[in-house]
Amino acid sequence: MIEADRLISAAVINDEESIDRAIRPKLLTEYVGQPHVREQMEIFIQAAKQRGDALDHVLIFGPPGLGKTTLANIIANEMGVNLRTTSGPVLEKAGDLAAMLTNLEPHDVLFIDEIHRLSPVVEEILYPAMEDYQLDIMIGEGPAARSIKLDLPPFTLIGATTRAGSLTSPLRDRFGIVQRLEFYQVADLEHIVSRSAKCLGLELTPEGAHQLARRSRGTPRITNRLLRRVRDFAEVRADGAINGEVAMKALDMLNVDAEGFDFMDRKLLLAVIDKFMGGPVGLDNLAAAIGEERETIEDVLEPYLIQQGFIQRTPRGRIATNHAYKHFGITREE
């Protein structure tokens, strides 16, 4: 199964980006959850503005769908500067990055999503740009080639990644501010989905918001997607209002259970329980058993299952916990 086909995927699906932009918070005062990140960024931004400096470079990492792009937009808005957006895979050549850097205004924010996917050649260009606000470029070819230095205006690089461990040490060490985004609490997601419903002109009761929030895997992007699908159900099968009962019926129909698990989550858990006696099972064997790539299991399926205590990683492999057995009503054999 392709990850983007899953309703509870944290990846961006189809035209969601334009909808997300419309309901995205613009300022830190509107930003819900991540209290430590919010408090720290308030201080760092205010201090930079008081000094008249560009904000230090920021690395934001964590699972997909938690608001890394949203936070980058908020930082630029709070600093009162332009935001230039790109991604690691798009910057194929050094010239691609050089063109973006030379078009920055003083204190602008350059946001690079999936920064762990930068090519080594492009990454080398970033080092002097981040450290000294200088751009080293080669003019000409062969024996006549020469290096020239261009001064850049002070700017802020914001890098976002789901795989901070894949960043090289020289790049990681050049970020003065490092923020990890955690899965959201249900209460925060209730606040987020209520705000989104208001922006979309939907009637959502507190009970409806709770049902959506608790099945959203701690991820705002999933919360907002479920809201749109439950809206469809409410308009066709009810009077358009989303209360607790309507939300439960809609989410059950969509095959999203009370823990926010879908078919793939249940398939993984049952594979560990049934095919491997609860584990431990190695990642390659587990990937073969459910027909998924190991990277998909590591980056997409496992993080939430581990965070919720349904799977444990051990030196010998993955183990299904008592929570997993209880979820399926299976008695664990000792």
Swiss-Prot record:
Instruction: Cite the entry's keywords alphabetically.
Output: ATP-binding, Cytoplasm, DNA damage, DNA recombination, DNA repair, DNA-binding, Hydrolase, Nucleotide-binding
GO MF annotation terms = ATP binding; ATP hydrolysis activity; four-way junction DNA binding; four-way junction helicase activity
Q: Supply the EC number(s).
A: 3.6.4.-
List the residue ranges of the region (Large ATPase domain (RuvB-L)): 4-184
User: Which residues lie in coiled coils?
Assistant: none
Q: Name one GO cellular component term.
A: Holliday junction resolvase complex
The record's top EC class is hydrolase
What reaction does this enzyme carry out catalytically? Answer: ATP + H2O = ADP + phosphate + H(+)
Purpose of the protein: The RuvA-RuvB-RuvC complex processes Holliday junction (HJ) DNA during genetic recombination and DNA repair, while the RuvA-RuvB complex plays an important role in the rescue of blocked DNA replication forks via replication fork reversal (RFR). RuvA specifically binds to HJ cruciform DNA, conferring on it an open structure. The RuvB hexamer acts as an ATP-dependent pump, pulling dsDNA into and through the RuvAB complex. RuvB forms 2 homohexamers on either side of HJ DNA bound by 1 or 2 RuvA tetramers; 4 subunits per hexamer contact DNA at a time.
Q: Into which family does the record put it?
A: Belongs to the RuvB family.
Assembly and partners are described as: Homohexamer. Forms an RuvA(8)-RuvB(12)-Holliday junction (HJ) complex. HJ DNA is sandwiched between 2 RuvA tetramers; dsDNA enters through RuvA and exits via RuvB. An RuvB hexamer assembles on each DNA strand where it exits the tetramer. Each RuvB hexamer is contacted by two RuvA subunits (via domain III) on 2 adjacent RuvB subunits; this complex drives branch migration. In the full resolvosome a probable DNA-RuvA(4)-RuvB(12)-RuvC(2) complex forms which resolves the HJ.
Name of the molecule in the record: Holliday junction branch migration complex subunit RuvB
Q: Whose protein is this, by species?
A: Yersinia pestis
Q: What is the lineage of its organism?
A: Bacteria, Pseudomonadati, Pseudomonadota, Gammaproteobacteria, Enterobacterales
